[in-house]
């Protein structure tokens, strides 16, 4: 970390909770936010899209008493959010919150965003600590992701459902290239091609049970593959994380 004339103890603390998809980052961050009263920032490029609330897991994230902030409120019509631009937004938001809070919690699993953030560590005006959440055993992990996929495919309190979000985007040809790059969507598209299902009306047509089971399993498989990649990359990015006792906040994990 770059030298500063400000004593380290006087600099705001930003605690990053990172890890693979579906391992409980939001729950861990929410628990810490409740215990400390600190605001939370979601370091996720996909969760910026308000029209992907179910697919991105943004829906249902609001918790009473916890102040959660996203990097922006975009729609698919705005296009992709590049990693550098997302990191700019993250740094600006954290700096604004850190000006009035001694602790800011950041949670996320975007590889490109967190890699970019780490490359800027020497420029940051705050102390950055990191807690990496581990991967569970493979069978346990895939089972958890399968349950999550089932929830995403079921319209309800957490939004209209993944199939509805995909169908809505697919009806506009200009959105298809970006939609096909989204984890979850790509699995559904693969099944639509295999079973001759119309993507633009996938949310309105009856889907045979065995096909729906295959869609669910494939979404879980794709998310698991991405989770294994996240686990490997974050281990490299945050290599050497060690326990750090932070006055008033207990034991956290630190990146030197």
Residue ranges of model-derived segments:
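Extended, non-globular alpha-helical segments
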Residues: 1-9, 70-75
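C-terminal accessory "lid"/substrate-recognition subdomains
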Residues: 2-6, 98, 113-256
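Pre-Walker A (Motif I) flank of P-loop NTPase domains
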Residues: 9-15, 101-102
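Glycine-rich phosphate-binding P-loop
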Residues: 14-32
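Hydrophobic/aromatic beta-strand patches that form the interior of the parallel beta-sheet core
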Residues: 15-17, 41, 69-71, 129-134
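Structural motif
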Residues: 19-20, 107-111, 135-136
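Catalytic cores of large soluble enzymes that bind and process phosphate-bearing ligands
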Residues: 21, 82, 211, 215
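N-terminal phosphate/diphosphate-binding loop that engages ATP/GTP or pyrophosphate donors
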Residues: 26-104, 112-118
């Amino acid at each position: 970390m770059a030298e500063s004339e400000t004593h380290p103890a006087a600099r705001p603390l930003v605690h990053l909770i990172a890890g693979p998809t579906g391992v409980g980052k939001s729950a861990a961050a929410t628990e810490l936010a409740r215990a400390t009263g600190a605001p939370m920032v979601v370091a996720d490029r996909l969760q910026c899209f308000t029209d992907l609330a179910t697919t991105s897991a943004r829906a249902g994230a609001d918790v009473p008493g916890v102040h959660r902030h996203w990097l922006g409120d975009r729609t698919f019509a705005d296009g992709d959010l590049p990693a550098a631009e997302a990191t700019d937004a993250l740094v600006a938001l954290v700096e604004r919150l850190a000006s009035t809070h001694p602790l800011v919690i950041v949670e996320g699993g975007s590889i490109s965003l967190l890699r970019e953030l780490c490359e800027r560590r020497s420029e940051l005006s705050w102390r950055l600590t990191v807690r990496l959440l581990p991967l569970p055993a493979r069978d346990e992990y895939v089972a958890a992701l399968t349950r999550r996929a089932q929830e995403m495919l079921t319209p309800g309190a957490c939004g209209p459902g993944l199939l509805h979000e995909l169908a809505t985007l697919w009806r506009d040809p200009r959105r298809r290239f970006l939609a096909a790059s989204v984890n979850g969507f790509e699995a559904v598209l693969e099944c639509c091609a295999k079973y001759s299902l119309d993507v633009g009306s996938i949310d309105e047509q009856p889907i045979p049970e065995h096909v729906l089971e295959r869609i669910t399993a494939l979404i879980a498989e794709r998310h698991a593959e991405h989770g294994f990649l996240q686990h490997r990359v974050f281990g490299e990015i945050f290599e050497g994380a060690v326990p750090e006792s932070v006055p008033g906040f207990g034991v956290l994990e630190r990146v030197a």
